[in-house]
Amino acid sequence: MAARLCCQLDTARDVLCLRPVGAESRGRPFSGSVGALPPSSPPAVPADHGAHLSLRGLPVCAFSSAGPCALRFTSARCMETTVNAPRNLPKVLHKRTLGLSTMSTTGIETYFKDCVFKDWEELGEEIRLKVFVLGGCRHKLVCSPAPCNFFTSA
């Protein structure tokens, strides 16, 4: 199962805000620094960790200060996923899921800047929303995600 997330850049705080697709009017967004992921896997996340954030349908690791175990970037327009992502990101995410050390924070930050910000900077897109697919995680979902149309622009 996967939870679909909207991603919006908050330029005032220089963070990416994540929230479930179709739930823009419910709950509050989950924010985190673009380069805040540590170089190694975080400890196990308790089942109730982050439940107060009202982000239904997300794995519990999504609420970890270290970020989710696996974050698969997908753009509905160019269909870029971890399958064809540069710098062996799928292997990195798989290692992180297994609790092994991964690439440096700088490497992860560079990847997201390349993928997430390239269209905005080079193509001049004003709508700074992208869609993320969060899945492939060893943690259980908090609850089943609400059905939504992946290709509906947020």
Swiss-Prot record:
Keyword Transcription regulation: yes
Post-translational modification: A fraction may be phosphorylated in insect cells and HepG2 cells, a human hepatoblastoma cell line. Phosphorylated in vitro by host protein kinase C or mitogen-activated protein kinase. N-acetylated in insect cells.
Pfam family of the protein (one): X
Gene Ontology terms: cellular component: host cell mitochondrion; host cell nucleus
Source species, domain of life: Viruses
Compartment(s): Host cytoplasm; Host nucleus; Host mitochondrion
Coiled-coil ranges from the UniProt annotation: none
Primary subcellular site in the record, as a coarse category: host cell
UniProt keyword Secreted, yes or no: no
Keywords assigned: Activation of host NF-kappa-B by virus, Activator, Apoptosis, Host cytoplasm, Host G2/M cell cycle arrest by virus, Host mitochondrion, Host nucleus, Host-virus interaction, Modulation of host cell cycle by virus, Transcription, Transcription regulation
Segments crossing the lipid bilayer: none
GO biological process: DNA-templated transcription; symbiont-mediated activation of host NF-kappaB cascade; symbiont-mediated arrest of host cell cycle during G2/M transition; viral genome replication
Region of interest called Mitochondrial targeting sequence, as start-end residue ranges on this chain: 68-117
Entry function: Multifunctional protein that plays a role in silencing host antiviral defenses and promoting viral transcription. Does not seem to be essential for HBV infection. May be directly involved in development of cirrhosis and liver cancer (hepatocellular carcinoma). Most of cytosolic activities involve modulation of cytosolic calcium. The effect on apoptosis is controversial depending on the cell types in which the studies have been conducted. May induce apoptosis by localizing in mitochondria and causing loss of mitochondrial membrane potential.
Family per record: Belongs to the orthohepadnavirus protein X family.
Quaternary context: May form homodimer. May interact with host CEBPA, CFLAR, CREB1, DDB1, E4F1, HBXIP, HSPD1/HSP60, NFKBIA, POLR2E and SMAD4. Interacts with host SMC5-SMC6 complex and induces its degradation. Interacts with host TRPC4AP; leading to prevent ubiquitination of TRPC4AP. Interacts with host PLSCR1; this interaction promotes ubiquitination and degradation of HBx and impairs HBx-mediated cell proliferation.
Name used for this protein in its record: Protein X
Native species: Orangutan hepatitis B virus (isolate Somad)
Lineage, highest ranks first: Viruses, Riboviria, Pararnavirae, Artverviricota, Revtraviricetes
